[in-house]
Amino acid sequence: MLKGKVVGLSEDGTATIKAQVPLAQFLHREVKEVYVDMIDSRPLSDKQRRMCYALVKAIADWSGSGSEEVKEAFKLDFWAERVDTLSDKIFSLSNAPMSLVAEFQRFLVAFILTHDVPTKRPLREYVDDIEAYTYLCLVRRKCAVCGRRAELHHIDAVGMGNDRTEVQHEGREVMSLCREHHTELHTVGKAEFMTKYHLDGGVPCDRTIMKIYGLRR
């Protein structure tokens, strides 16, 4: 593996990377592909660390295992799924980069949503990336507010003047809500609802979501 560093960055975002290639490889044109991994040097925050440990503890309490055992098992599973893009060492929650910990956080949240693991506070309060959380809830068909079984909710009410069988779903703003919170949103309005539950709104409906909910287009 060759390692290099960014030596220049233009206003249009073009980066110049300098790496030392062994002369024999260069002369025989043996370097055919280049994989660039932009290393995130931002350290994780104390808030991120606390959130991860809280998620781990919730899983540990639910499974009857120890928190340390659960943490190491999930770190190993997370690493195994990303072995092609991560280093050869298991990361540590004491000094891992911010972006990696955020991805691990989403990994834990996905497990909790899939297996209905109870948490002391609403799950959305344990995440930094609300948009990613909203998408995970859609994929797992869980209410973004309470975690109960949910259905697809169009933020811009399809039922008002639109034929649901003819509407273009792809790209529309959606989120998953249980019947109770679906009704509440329509009662109090989008702005008040999102503020109350600290949500940023829906996410664009893509083909993955369309397939899950049986939408034709």
Segments predicted by a language model, with ranges:
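The feature represents the first ordered module of a protein
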Residues: Q25-E81
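Charged, alpha-helical interface segments at or near domain boundaries
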Residues: V70-R121
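Short cysteine-rich loop/turn motifs with clustered Cys
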Residues: D128-I155, E180
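Generic N-terminal amphipathic/basic segments
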Residues: M1-Y35, D40-P43
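Short Fe-S-cluster ligation motifs
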Residues: E173-E180, P204-R217
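Short Cys/His-rich Zn2+-coordinating modules
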Residues: R121-Y133, D156-R164
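Short Cys/His-centered divalent metal-binding micro-motifs
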Residues: V174-T195
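Histidine-centered nuclease catalytic patch
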Residues: K142-V174, K190-A191
